[in-house]
From Swiss-Prot:
It catalyses: L-arginyl-[protein] + ATP = N(omega)-phospho-L-arginyl-[protein] + ADP + H(+). This is Protein-arginine kinase. Residues 20-243 form the Phosphagen kinase C-terminal domain. One of its GO terms (molecular function) is creatine kinase activity. It comes from the Bacteria. It comes from Staphylococcus haemolyticus (strain JCSC1435). Its EC number is 2.7.14.1. Transmembrane segments: none annotated. PANTHER family: ARGININE KINASE 1-RELATED, ARGININE OR CREATINE KINASE. GO terms for biological process: phosphocreatine biosynthetic process. Keywords: ATP-binding, Kinase, Nucleotide-binding, Transferase. InterPro entries: Arg_Kinase (IPR023660), ATP-guanido_PTrfase (IPR000749), ATP-guanido_PTrfase_AS (IPR022415), ATP-guanido_PTrfase_cat (IPR022414), Gln_synth/guanido_kin_cat_dom (IPR014746). PROSITE patterns: PHOSPHAGEN_KINASE (PS00112), PHOSPHAGEN_KINASE_C (PS51510).
Length: 335
């Protein structure tokens, strides 16, 4: 069973944090024949029937029905990237999770089924193999919507075809500081890729963290999408590394000032917003990656989750604000 109070999933603890690649994800969107799409369910019972059908095929995964959860626990799942903010809005929705939470299957978001396989490093092909195996299991027992000319049929036209979204989460402080991200976004957009915020489409960028993903799925195979995205991501990584080298060679004093100012704020602030905290943490991580800082308890990925309101807020203790609690946590982990 998923631990709602664990700040990061077990799969994220298995490897050392990378300087740039935070995580990779493969998502497959699937719909069921003879069911209206989730956004058009006549009643909640239609949604619960879909949940039961999917759960029956995958009994080894833990089911969490969102209608039985409070808002704070729902937001914890969002913070850990196990569900999307959109899933919360659906009255009859659920998520299936494996033990280490590297597999997350959203039920009744925009589509009936969204299979997610998540991992560290640039492991897109391995993750696709995992997601594809689950997809095959579902396909053997359920009537999946598929057209021999178009491919998998999805609610959003941009997902029609393979129904696959491949994405990589990158920490790019160098490119952000040098204001290169708009140019990169325009360039990769011409090749069918996009840059989004930390929680996908329409979300805000926090802590110089960007999600790079494919935009279209029609007309390309899964392998082509994965290969092309991997190449694009590798080029962005190379450019980030070049910028970091330039920051140390030609702008070292300014870079050190930026890093140590952020460290000082994290070590001494008494109240701090999520937005400011994320950027200060990003610059401290940059300092660690460049070899300027050594902080034994500093874990960027985990801190970026644990300082979110869902993990801080306690309605039984209203004497201390979320921003104050956040500052207390950050002082503890940046000494």
């Amino acid at each position: 069973m998923s631990d709602m109070n664990a700040h990061i999933s077990e799969w994220m603890k298995e490897t050392e944090e990378s300087p740039i690649v935070m995580s990779s994800r493969i998502r497959l969107a699937r719909n069921l024949e003879n069911h209206v799409h989730p956004l058009m369910f006549p009643s909640e019972q239609d949604g619960f029937r879909v949940i039961n059908e999917v759960q029956d095929v995958l009994p080894d995964l833990d089911l969490m029905r969102l209608d039985t959860m409070d808002q704070q626990n729902k937001m914890k799942l969002v913070a850990k990237h196990l569900i999307s903010p959109e899933l919360i809005k659906q009255p009859a929705s659920a998520v299936l999770l494996n033990k280490d939470e590297s597999i997350s299957i959203m039920i009744n978001e925009e589509d009936h089924i969204r299979i997610q396989a998540m991992g560290t490093d640039l492991s897109l092909q391995d993750l696709y193999n995992i997601a594809s195996e689950i997809d095959d299991t579902l396909d053997q027992s359920l009537d999946i919507s598929y057209d021999e000319h178009l491919g998998y049929l999805t609610t959003c036209p941009t997902n029609i075809g393979t129904g696959m979204r491949a994405s990589v989460m990158l920490h790019l402080p160098g490119l952000s500081i040098m204001k290169r991200m708009n140019r990169i976004a325009q360039t990769i957009n011409r090749f069918g890729f996009t840059i989004r915020g930390i929680y996908g489409e329409g979300s805000q960028v926090y802590g110089h963290i960007y999600q790079i993903s494919n935009q279209l799925t029609l007309g390309k195979t899964e392998d082509e999408i994965i290969d092309n995205l991997t190449e694009v991501v590798q080029q962005i990584i190379n450019e980030e590394m070049q910028i970091r080298e330039r920051l140390t060679q030609y702008n070292e004093l300014e870079t050190l000032d930026r890093i140590y100012r952020s460290l000082g704020i994290l070590q001494n602030s008494r109240i701090i917003s999520m937005e400011e905290a994320s950027y200060r943490l990003s610059e401290v991580k940059l300092g660690i990656d460049l070899g300027y800082l050594t902080l034994s308890d500093f874990k960027f990925n985990e801190l970026m989750v644990s300082i979110q309101s869902a993990f801080i807020y306690n309605d039984e203790d209203e004497t201390i604000s979320v921003n104050e609690k956040r500052a207390n946590i950050l002082r503890e982990y940046t000494q």
